[in-house]
C-alpha cells in the first residue's frame, strides 16, 4: 500500500482478466460503478470519479515461474488526495495476494 496516490497512474497486476473481473465487485465496495469492455467508471462516494482501464500484458517470467499480468491505468477526476487514498487502500487490500 502506498501513502500517496496521484490523480493518474499506471501499474501492473499479477492476475488474469478473469481473476480481475471476479475481484471487481468487492474491490469497488459501496461505490457505484459501471463496466464497459476493458474499462470501469466509478462514482466515488466522497465526490469525484475514477476511470480504470486494463489490458492483458505478456506474462512475467522469473526462472521457471510465469505470472499473468494486466496493465492497469487509473485516472481520478475531481477527487482530492483523501478520497483517492481512501478508495485505493480498500482496492489494494481487496486485490492483494500472497505476502505482497
Question: Whereabouts are the PLM-identified features?
Answer:
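A common structural junction motif
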Residues: 28-29, 91-99
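Short beta-strand-to-loop capping motifs
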Residues: 11-15, 44, 74-79
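A general secondary-structure signal for short beta-strands and their flanking turns/coil
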Residues: 2-8, 47, 67-69
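Short, conserved charged micro-motifs
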Residues: 17-22, 80-86
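Terminal, regulation- and interaction-focused segments at domain boundaries
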Residues: 1-31
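Intrinsically disordered, low-complexity regulatory segments
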Residues: 34-51
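Intrinsically disordered, low-complexity regulatory segments enriched in Ser/Thr/Pro
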Residues: 58-79
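A short, structured beta-strand/loop element
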Residues: 47-63
Amino acid at each position: 500500500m502506498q501513502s500517496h496516490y496521484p490523480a493518474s497512474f499506471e501499474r501492473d497486476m499479477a492476475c488474469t482478466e478473469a481473476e480481475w473481473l471476479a475481484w471487481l465487485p468487492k474491490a469497488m465496495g459501496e461505490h457505484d460503478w459501471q463496466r464497459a469492455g476493458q474499462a470501469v467508471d466509478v462514482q466515488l462516494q466522497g465526490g469525484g470519479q475514477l476511470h480504470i482501464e486494463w489490458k492483458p500484458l505478456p506474462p512475467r517470467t522469473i526462472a521457471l515461474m510465469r505470472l499473468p499480468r494486466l496493465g492497469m491505468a487509473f485516472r481520478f477526476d475531481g477527487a482530492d488526495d483523501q478520497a483517492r487514498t481512501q478508495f485505493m487502500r480498500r482496492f489494494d487490500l481487496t486485490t492483494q495476494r500472497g505476502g505482497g
